Regions:
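Short, solvent-exposed coil/turn linker segments
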Residues: 1-2, 38, 42, 95, ...
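Short linear Ser/Thr-Pro motifs
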Residues: 16, 34, 73, 114, ...
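Phosphate-binding loop of NTP-binding sites
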Residues: 25, 62-65, 74-233
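Short, flexible coil/turn micro-motifs enriched in small/turn-prone residues
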Residues: 7, 12, 52, 108-111, ...
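Beta-strand->loop->alpha-helix junctions that form or flank phosphate-binding loops
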Residues: 32-36, 55-58, 94-98, 138-140, ...
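Cofactor-binding loop segments of dinucleotide-utilizing enzymes, especially the Rossmann-like FAD-
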Residues: 13, 35-36, 114, 142, ...
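N-terminal leader/targeting and accessory segments in enzymes
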Residues: 1-95, 99
């Protein structure tokens, strides 16, 4: 994308919003950052000296009059009047995670779930580093620093492990090459409103995969057990016995077992092993 022609409004001045602002300014975009807090309540030092316009203390609808893309930080609700008005006007919505996936040159393992996603993300990263000490492995997303801050340093031969929350996923229109859902149980219903909406947000990590991609899913969770099938290839994991299809499980003696009917990558093996061990 030629960002030099784009006017981007970012809602939320926390770490995701400021990281995204720095990235977009570097790409040549015209950036406005808006936050409901006052300047003294925010840490905006990372944006000092950059050509960013600030609108603080409110999110006026007039921000949309000169807006080609509206980006939300992770904690910004999607039911705000300005977000609803952007949808009415047909202004695209995105966030730092979505723009990162759009531009990342390296394969990405994306991990989400109601529980265990941070541990699994960290473990997958460590396993990949141990497998090939000479290869750069980037771990981030909903943990650590926003990965978009590192985008200019990531090379095609690197590997990326990305934790993704439901807040990030609900605005994304791209799936990672390997997508893992540890489990789905009722959570964040104050944000999503219904369990069905929460499940739909989590499912978006899978929705844009191609037949060349992979999904790693729990056979023990009633929600994720229904998410295999069409699209990407599926690997299952279970602590209750051997899955009917390819995957990993813990046998009666407590040993980790893996069955794969086709060749897989170290990245896929790491994701499969980590989710069952977390």
């Amino acid at each position: 994308m030629d960002w030099s022609t784009q006017r981007v409004v970012i809602l939320g001045g926390a770490r995701q919003g400021t990281a995204l602002a720095r990235y977009l300014v570097a790409q040549g975009a015209q950036v406005t950052l808006s936050d409901l807090k006052a300047a003294h309540q925010l840490d905006l030092q990372l944006l000092a000296g950059l050509p960013v316009r600030f609108v603080l203390g409110e999110h006026p609808l007039s921000l949309l009059d000169e807006c080609d893309l509206l980006c939300l930080s992770g904690g910004v609700p999607t039911d705000l009047p300005i977000v609803q008005e952007a949808r009415r006007r047909g202004i695209p919505l995105s966030n730092d995670a979505g723009l990162f996936l759009d531009a990342c040159p390296a394969p990405v393992i994306g991990i989400t779930g109601s529980a265990g996603k941070t541990t699994t993300t960290t473990l997958v990263g460590e396993m990949l580093k141990a497998d090939n000490p000479g290869r750069a492995v980037w771990v981030g997303g909903n943990i650590g620093n926003p990965l978009i801050s590192d985008l200019d340093r990531i090379q095609p031969g690197d590997r990326v492990v990305m934790e993704l929350s439901s807040f990030q996923l609900e605005l994304m229109n791209r799936s990672p090459h390997i997508a893992c859902i540890t489990n789905i149980t009722p959570n964040h219903l104050d944000r999503h409103g219904t369990l069905e909406a929460y499940i739909a947000a989590k499912r978006r990590i899978l929705d844009f995969q191609s037949p060349d991609d992979w999904r790693v899913l729990s056979a023990d969770n009633s929600v994720t057990a229904a998410l295999g099938g069409e699209g990407a290839s599926t690997l299952w994991f279970s602590t209750r016995g051997r899955p009917a299809e390819d995957g990993a499980w813990v046998d009666e003696a407590g040993n980790l077992r893996v069955r794969l009917s086709r060749a897989s990558s170290p990245e896929l093996q790491a994701a499969e092993g980590a989710v069952i061990c977390h």
